[in-house]
Design a protein with these regions (language model features):
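Binuclear metal-dependent phosphoesterase catalytic core
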Residues: 120-127, 214-274, 289
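Well-ordered alpha-helical segments embedded in enzymatic catalytic cores
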Residues: 39-43, 74, 271
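His/Asp/Glu-rich metal-coordinating catalytic cores
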Residues: 54, 65-234
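Glycine-rich phosphate-binding loop signature in dinucleotide/nucleotide-binding domains
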Residues: 49-51, 155-157, 282-283
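Hydrophobic pocket-lining residues that define ligand/cofactor binding sites across diverse proteins
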Residues: 47, 82, 279
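Accessory, non-catalytic peripheral segments of nucleic-acid enzymes
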Residues: 247-404
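N-terminal active-site segment of His-dependent metallophosphoesterases
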Residues: 1-69, 380-387, 391
Length: 404
C-alpha cells in the first residue's frame, strides 16, 4: 500500500482577543489582532499548493464557546476552498469551542467531518489504503474524565489507524487536566499515529508510533514563545515522516543584551537596536521581552537618572516604523549580584530571607500551597526552589529600586 499524507494541526484559537497589550500603535495592534487568521491562511494556502490527502484539526478551532461571526465566516470560507480542491477535513471541538456553547451556526461543506460528542470513526480510502480516524468533540467545557476506553483497540493492521484526542497527560501538572490519558494507554490502542491537541507547546511524546502535540498555530501571549505551526505527516504501515511547518504571523520571543562595561546611553541603545534587528531577521514580525543582562557598576549608572519605563519608551520610539514590526512588550533588568549589597534595603531583605528555614518559607507561601484550586498543580517545596525564589526576589527588588 502507498503512503498517505496529512496535515496535523490543533488549537487555532481564531479571533483570539490578545489581552494585555498596551501602548501599541494601531497598525501594530491590527497585525497582532489578525495574526491567528493570517496563520490559518498560511495552512490553507499550503494545503491547496501541496494537496495532502486530508487535514486533521484537533480541537479549539475557535477561541470561545460563542464562536465569533468573523471567525466562523473565515473558517467556512477556508473549508469551501478546500472543498473545491477535494481535500477532506476531519475536525473536533475542544474545551474552548465545545458543543454546548451558544453561537450562530454556519453550514460547512461536505468535505468536512465534524466529530460528535461520542467517540466515532471516520473511514477514508486513499489510493486503496483504508484509513480509520477516531475521535470526539467536547460536549461541554470541562471534560475531566478519561475518554481512552471509548477508543477501540486496533486489530486489522492492514488499516492505518489514527487517533485524535484533545487532552492532557495525567502527569502534566502545568495545565488544567482535560480528557486525561497516559502514554501507555495510547500505545495500548495499537494505532499508527496519535494526533493530539490542547497543549500549546510542540511535543513528541513517543517516537514510534508517533504521539504528537503540534502546539498552537499562533502564539497568543508572551508565555507562548517561539515559532508555531503544524505537522506535515507522511504515514505508511512501515514508516512515518514528520515535517514541522511554520505558520506564526507574529512570534513572541525573548531578546537579551549584554550590558557589561557600558557607560553611555547611546551605546546601550545601539546594542538594543542591533539585537532587535537580528531578531527581526530571524523571526519577522515579533513581540519581545527585552532582557538587559549583566548590569554591573558601570552600566547601573545608566538607570540612576532614567527609569525603566523611560528606557522602554525610548527603545519603542527607536523601533517605531521599522518593518516587520518588533514590539518591545517588556523591559527586564538583570542586575549583577555584586550590586545587591549597594542598597541597604536590598541587603536587609536578603539577610532576612537567609534566616528563614524551610518551615518559615512554607508558612509564608501557605496561601499558595493551601489554595483549593491550585495546590494540586504545585510540586513540594525544595531547597532548590527556595534558592530560586531568593534570586528572583533580589532581582525584582533591584529592578523596583531602579524604577523609582
Amino acid at each position: 500500500m502507498s503512503a498517505i499524507r496529512f496535515f496535523h494541526m490543533a488549537d487555532l484559537h481564531l479571533d483570539s482577543p490578545f489581552k494585555g497589550l498596551f501602548g501599541l500603535p494601531e497598525h501594530n495592534f491590527k497585525k497582532i489582532r489578525t495574526s491567528t487568521f493570517e496563520a490559518f491562511n498560511t495552512i490553507i494556502d499550503k494545503a491547496i499548493q501541496e494537496k495532502p490527502d486530508f487535514l486533521l484539526i484537533v480541537g479549539d478551532i475557535y477561541d470561545g464557546e460563542n464562536r465569533s461571526l468573523p471567525a466562523q465566516r473565515r473558517f467556512q470560507e477556508a473549508m469551501e476552498k478546500l472543498f473545491q480542491h477535494n481535500i477532506p477535513v476531519i475536525l473536533s471541538y475542544g474545551n474552548h469551542d465545545h458543543l454546548n456553547g451558544s453561537w450562530t451556526r454556519f453550514a460547512l461543506p461536505s468535505n468536512v467531518y465534524e466529530l460528535p460528542a461520542e467517540t466515532s470513526v471516520v473511514q477514508l480510502n486513499i489510493r486503496g489504503q483504508q484509513v480509520n480516524i477516531y475521535g470526539f468533540s467536547y460536549s461541554e467545557r470541562h471534560v475531566k474524565e478519561s475518554k481512552i476506553e471509548s477508543y477501540p483497540i486496533a486489530s486489522d493492521q492492514h488499516v492505518l489507524h489514527i487517533g485524535m484526542l484533545h487532552g492532557s497527560e495525567f502527569s502534566d501538572t502545568t495545565h488544567a487536566v482535560y480528557a486525561p490519558f497516559t502514554k501507555e494507554q495510547l500505545l495500548e490502542r495499537n494505532y499508527h499515529y496519535w494526533a493530539l491537541g490542547h497543549i500549546h507547546k510542540r511535543q513528541l511524546l513517543h517516537q514510534n508510533p508517533p504521539i504528537v502535540y503540534p502546539g498552537n498555530i499562533q502564539s497568543r501571549h508572551r508565555k507562548e514563545q517561539g515559532i508555531k505551526g503544524f505537522y506535515d505527516v507522511t504515514l505508511s504501515q512501515a514508516s512515518v515522516e514528520l515535517d514541522f511547518i511554520l505558520t506564526s504571523a507574529v512570534v513572541y520571543n525573548t531578546v537579551e543584551v549584554d550590558c557589561k562595561n557600558m557607560f553611555h546611553a547611546n551605546e546601550l541603545l545601539k546594542k538594543c537596536e542591533e539585537a532587535l534587528s537580528l531578531n527581526r531577521q530571524a523571526y519577522g514580525a515579533s513581540v519581545v521581552e527585552l532582557h538587559l543582562k549583566n548590569i554591573d557598576e558601570h552600566a547601573s549608572s545608566l538607570f540612576e537618572h532614567a527609569t525603566v519605563d523611560a528606557w522602554l519608551e525610548t527603545i519603542r520610539e527607536a523601533e517605531d516604523g521599522i518593518e516587520p514590526m518588533c514590539w518591545v512588550q517588556k523591559l527586564v533588568l538583570h542586575t549583577s549580584s555584586t550590586l545587591y549589597e549597594h542598597t541597604a534595603a536590598t541587603k536587609s531583605v536578603v539577610n532576612l530571607m537567609e534566616q528563614w528555614d524551610i518551615t518559615a518559607w512554607k508558612d509564608i507561601l501557605k496561601d499558595l500551597y493551601q489554595h483549593a484550586g491550585g495546590a494540586r498543580f504545585i510540586d513540594p517545596l525544595t531547597e532548590q526552589d527556595i534558592k530560586a525564589l531568593m534570586n528572583n526576589a533580589q532581582e525584582l527588588l533591584a529592578e523596583e529600586i531602579q524604577r523609582t
